[in-house]
């Protein structure tokens, strides 16, 4: 998605993590500059959130209405969620464009296993995952998803997915071998059998809670995209 301003000023990294401070700029700025960049960031988040909502067919949205959008800057600002935003810089006359978003956060859930037993848990949940239609089937979704996994220090099978689309479930099966075979959860989250193994280990005291890690993606060199931060080095020429 393209914007009429330089997105790299508001999104300093190839994949930028945004929390409730709405302040990923990582440098000293005067008040006026910070407000301008933050306002541009709000525009990015809200427009990508609206695009995601439309793609998920939640409801029809207009440019004046954010009702139904899972991801908005206002909602992010009053939560403990994290939003990962993937960009591409050397397009749109150098202004760049936003490729996709991925929002995660912990939620207290009651989930049912194969036996019908109910468990209370606090898993990391995928709350919104959207890659712009023009950038799908290019590896961008997996790039964004894997970066989140590493940053949050989480295993895919331990995630809870909020109302995943058929396309998202196919993505999880293709790349991680995960199948939606458990009974349908009343809360519309999809979970996997390995999550119950984790719950049992935690109850028995046999596992330590993982903490998110701090990742800093490199700045891609001119004309090429660097994907060095996933223990891989891939150079993609324009």
From Swiss-Prot:
Keywords: Acyltransferase, Transferase. It is an enzyme of class 2 (transferase). InterPro entries: Atat, GNAT_ATAT. GO terms for molecular function: tubulin N-acetyltransferase activity. Acetyl-CoA binds at residues 129-142, 165-174. Its EC number is 2.3.1.108. GO terms for cellular component: microtubule. One of its GO terms (biological process) is microtubule cytoskeleton organization. The keyword Acyltransferase applies. Residues 1-196 form the N-acetyltransferase domain. Pfam families: Acetyltransf_16. It catalyses: L-lysyl-[alpha-tubulin] + acetyl-CoA = N(6)-acetyl-L-lysyl-[alpha-tubulin] + CoA + H(+). Specifically acetylates 'Lys-40' in alpha-tubulin on the lumenal side of microtubules. Promotes microtubule destabilization and accelerates microtubule dynamics; this activity may be independent of acetylation activity. Acetylates alpha-tubulin with a slow enzymatic rate, due to a catalytic site that is not optimized for acetyl transfer. Enters the microtubule through each end and diffuses quickly throughout the lumen of microtubules. Belongs to the acetyltransferase ATAT1 family. This is Alpha-tubulin N-acetyltransferase.
């Amino acid at each position: 998605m393209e914007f009429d301003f330089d997105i790299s000023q508001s999104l300093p990294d190839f994949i930028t993590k945004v929390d409730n401070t709405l302040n990923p700029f990582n440098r000293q700025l005067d008040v006026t500059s910070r407000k301008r960049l933050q306002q541009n960031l709000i525009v990015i988040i809200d427009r990508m959130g609206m695009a995601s909502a439309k793609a998920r067919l939640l409801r029809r949205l207009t440019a004046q209405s954010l009702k139904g959008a899972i991801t908005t800057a206002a909602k992010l600002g009053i939560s403990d969620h994290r939003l990962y935003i993937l960009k591409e810089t050397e397009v749109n006359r150098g202004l760049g464009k936003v490729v996709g978003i991925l929002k995660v956060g912990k939620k207290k859930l009651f989930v049912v296993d194969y036996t019908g037993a109910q468990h209370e848990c606090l898993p990391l949940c995928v709350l919104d995952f959207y890659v712009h239609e023009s950038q799908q089937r290019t590896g961008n979704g997996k790039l964004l998803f894997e970066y989140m996994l590493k940053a949050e220090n989480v295993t895919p099978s331990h995630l809870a997915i909020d109302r995943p689309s058929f396309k998202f479930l196919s993505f999880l099966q293709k790349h991680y071998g995960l199948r939606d075979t458990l009974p349908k959860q009343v809360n519309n989250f999809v979970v996997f059998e390995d999550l119950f193994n984790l719950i049992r280990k935690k109850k028995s005291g046999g596992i330590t809670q993982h903490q998110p890690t701090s990742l800093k993606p490199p700045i891609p060199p001119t004309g090429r995209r660097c994907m060095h931060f996933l223990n891989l080095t891939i150079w993609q020429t324009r």
